[in-house]
A protein has these predicted regions:
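Catalytic phosphate/metal-binding cores of nucleic-acid and nucleotide-processing enzymes, i.e., regions
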Residues: 1-26, 33-35, 39, 50, ...
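Charged, structured surface patches that assemble and position nucleic-acid processing machinery
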Residues: 44, 63-66
Length: 169
């Protein structure tokens, strides 16, 4: 195989770095990819974050493979017009929704970590009264709107679970 180079804007989980020890290639992590320097492109697209660069790549006739990911991600919805309702952009998972954490930091003096730990225990062992663990599948591939982020949130527990599932694709 000829020598090749992989250029990326991030390798947060170190997947490409580990792969580079098994297969010989040059790994470049850059702030911004110069499209004039690439011959082929693979885009892992989630929440349509890369639509603009995909258009640019197609306009330059660079061979491209787009892999659409159905990941869940907890996001902050402070200041949105939808507030405690779902929208096309996100599914509300805070208080008052069936996805909300039944444990509050304001009751019993529990801190954030403790109420998330309690939520995770009930989630892992399917102990909620108003929702079953299997119902959370409905949230796969969605942004999970909450007021906690960027701090730790029960939405992180939900997202981690959903993102660990094999979607068969």
């Amino acid at each position: 195989m000829d020598d090749f180079k992989i250029t990326t804007t991030h390798d947060k989980r170190g997947i490409l770095l580990r792969l580079s020890t098994e297969i010989t290639f040059e790994l470049n992590i850059v702030k911004e990819v110069n499209l004039n320097d690439i011959s082929h492109s693979i885009i892992f697209n989630c929440f349509n974050e890369y639509n603009e660069i995909i258009t640019e790549i197609k306009e330059k006739n660079i061979p491209i493979r787009i892999i659409n990911l159905k990941l869940a991600k907890a996001i902050n919805i402070k200041g949105t017009t939808f507030g405690k309702g779902s929208s096309e952009t996100y599914e509300y998972i805070g208080r008052g929704s069936k996805w909300g954490n039944p444990y509050s930091m304001y009751e019993n003096g529990d801190d954030r970590d403790e109420v998330i730990r309690k939520f995770k225990y009930d989630f892992d062992f399917d102990k909620f009264l108003n929702v079953k663990k299997e119902d959370f599948i409905h949230l796969k591939g969605k942004k999970l709107g909450c007021f906690c982020k960027p701090q730790a949130c029960h939405g992180d527990v939900i997202a981690d679970y959903l993102n660990s599932l094999d979607d068969g694709e």
